[in-house]
């Protein structure tokens, strides 16, 4: 089964507002772009047939183009509606993987692990959200991103009679939304672009993370 990935990206001027007391607007945009690049790098190394970045932000388009992703201009003001827009031309016999742009520790083998699961595969976020979602049948699926989306997506899959596989990946269970998340990212092993930037920001601002 072919796999099509969709990465939704907010307008960067609205990105990471909960980090505003720690990072200025330019730093937040820089971090958001670094995380997007990390996500697209991982997807480009996996066996995904196509990656679509849906956004209204031209800077996101530039990163998407650099990684060979398809650009979809977001015509909506709603995440779930945007996902439907990006998925409209995905073949009925393909699988769709939804990946947020702020999980910079994503690895190619994470993608293939989910792709190997029959039915619906979900990686939960630590706050009750959904950080990876794979569904094999877009025509019969309702996207429910938002508060408590993990439980809601599981219920939606079961309501339709689909098997649900919960794939817990600790390195993907945190969105980078708060200072604690930024510190956590900096402390994890690895040297992604977002990790290097997080360490630079925290060291510059006097945070001791080692």
From Swiss-Prot:
Signal peptide: none
Keyword match GTP-binding: yes
Gene Ontology biological process terms from the UniProt entry: F420-0 metabolic process
Keywords: GTP-binding, Nucleotide-binding, Nucleotidyltransferase, Transferase
Enzyme class, UniProt record, top EC level: transferase
Catalytic activity of the protein: phosphoenolpyruvate + GTP + H(+) = enolpyruvoyl-2-diphospho-5'-guanosine + diphosphate
The protein's annotated pathway: Cofactor biosynthesis; coenzyme F420 biosynthesis
Binding positions for phosphoenolpyruvate per the UniProt entry: 130, 146, 149
Superkingdom, taxonomy of origin: Bacteria
One Pfam family hit: CofC
The protein's Enzyme Commission number: 2.7.7.105
Record has Nucleotide-binding as a keyword: yes
UniProt GO MF annotations: GTP binding; phospholactate guanylyltransferase activity
Note: The exact nature of the substrate is currently not known. This entry has been annotated based on its similarity to Actinobacteria.
Function per UniProt: Guanylyltransferase that catalyzes the activation of phosphoenolpyruvate (PEP) as enolpyruvoyl-2-diphospho-5'-guanosine, via the condensation of PEP with GTP. It is involved in the biosynthesis of coenzyme F420, a hydride carrier cofactor.
Family: Belongs to the CofC family.
Protein's UniProt name: Phosphoenolpyruvate guanylyltransferase
Organism: Roseiflexus castenholzii (strain DSM 13941 / HLO8)
